[in-house]
Amino acid sequence: MGFFHDFLSRPTTYAILAVLVIPVTALAWDRLPPLLPSAKRLLVGKKNPSKITSLECPYSYIRQIYGTHHWAPFVDKLSPSLKTERPAKYHMILEIMDGIHLCLMLVDDISDGSDYRKGRPAAHHIYGPSETANRAYYRVTQLLNRTGHEFPELAPWLLQCLEEILEGQDLSLVWRRDGLSAFPVQPEERVAAYRQMAYLKTGALFRLVGQLVLENQSYDDTLSTVAWYSQLQNDCKNVYSSDYAKAKGAIAEDLRNGELSYPIVVALNVPKGQYVVPALEFRSPHNIRQALRVIQSDQVRNICLTEMKKSAVSIQDWLALWGRNEKMDMKSEK
């Protein structure tokens, strides 16, 4: 003990220890893996995802969630004989509609930072955002190439609608990036701007199925109305449906992401709309709660549900095919 006491009491002892310990520590640290994942590492998915989902590909994963050829009822209504008279075209249209629709969902979930899709982990949480986005673009490119070679008469319809879908999505992303400074000020102009965005982003997807089947635009107005109803339904269930909140793992995901939706636009225009603005600019829990009280108020909720009912009047037969009917059962806490 005396030796160690004498050794530690010498002025040079700590210098000697530093000379020994620092290189050894540095050498050991150099061989350790990162304790926390880096931002770049988070872009990469989990190894061997097939062990988690039994599927290796993000597109196959989301297709398993939604099923295949879920646009078939629309195609059959537009052309009851297409399946038997031109089976190759029939199958190609269903593949195109699956591909465009589901790949948009894959990228949307990345943009929104969604945790779940229909109660299942969002694809990018398994495969990583980079691979998920690339697979989506890869699948769409495959469909474009195949359409151009096998069904060149369908290619112009597909390209035009895809451009409109992405134009609408771009508008939505710019509004989210720049906030209300990029959005109209007057109430009527706000609603019109939002409807135009939905006409592009959602409307073009629905118009696409009609144009591919009939190779004309004769059903554009009808399918645009179906699309507007679908957009309203999706927007409303985001803030009014408890079933949807459970499936997504969050309520008011649009608001939390700073993304405009029809209930948010309507809420901006009511007397207490000033409480919504801070939630879009500074998304603190307090601001979100204040905004939700307005968005889930009877006034805003009734305006939104009335618009849904109004848009549904002329398209009941199409909505029966669409078959989505979430309960809008959530209201503001008084």
UniProtKB/Swiss-Prot annotation:
InterPro entries named among the record's database cross-references: Isoprenoid_synthase_dom_sf, Polyprenyl_synt
Pfam (any one): polyprenyl_synt
Pathway involvement of the protein, from the record: Secondary metabolite biosynthesis
Residues that, per the record, bind Mg(2+) 1: D108, D112
Function according to Swiss-Prot or TrEMBL: Prenyl transferase; part of the ATM1 gene cluster that mediates the biosynthesis of aflatrem, a tremorgenic mycotoxin with acute neurotoxic effects. Synthesis of geranylgeranyl diphosphate (GGPP) by AtmG (a GGPP synthase) precedes condensation of GGPP with indole 3-glycerol phosphate, followed by epoxidation and cyclization by AtmM (a FAD-dependent monooxygenase) and AtmC (a prenyltransferase) to produce paspaline. AtmB is also essential for paspaline production, but its exact role has not been identified yet.
Domain of life, source organism: Eukaryota
Protein name: Prenyl transferase atmC
Source organism per UniProt: Aspergillus flavus
